Amino acid sequence: MKQVINCLKENNPLINKKLKEVSVDEGLKIAEELFRILNERKDGIGLAANQVGIDASVAVVNVREPIILINPKIIKQWEPVPYFEGCLSFKGKSVQTQRYSNIIIKTEQEEAEWYFSGAPNPSDGKGSWEKQEQSKHDQELRLLEAICVQHEIDHLNGITISDRQMLTTIVNTEKFGRNEIVMITNGEETKELKYKKAKPLID
């Protein structure tokens, strides 16, 4: 019976590998197994095939509802947002990454593109969404869902949260407010600074 491989304690040769694409039928079978593992653990909201030793571009997410990702690709992403993430493959480790509050993806099993948004007021005509008032809790869940989808798609491309932490050195700097906390990487040292203090270091 397959289980999540803890990369802090044992080697997982697939964790940094771009996974092979699979058919929809094979992907659905793998997704069923991933949901079983996720439901048994009860401490995660998403899981990718390589986290349990399967070389297949398949992942599942379960935040607001179960989502299956077979050979997914991010078509568009916008509105960067800093976020602290953990990972079942690196249990107990948490890093700040930069994700996007809005993404559009395409999967193998769906003809239409999927739009995920954690933004309070989605706008600018990208994708489609329901125009209704959202509670703060619902906004938080939608953002978490969008970030989890990005996290799992990263896994399918051999990218982990450790890789994303190193990339959080200010991208699209005009999106950050003066007092927003960002992460600066200088050689091997990574530290948090307010954007107004970090900006001179990256200009």
PLM features: residue spans?
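Positively charged
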Residues: 1-181, 185-192, 196-202
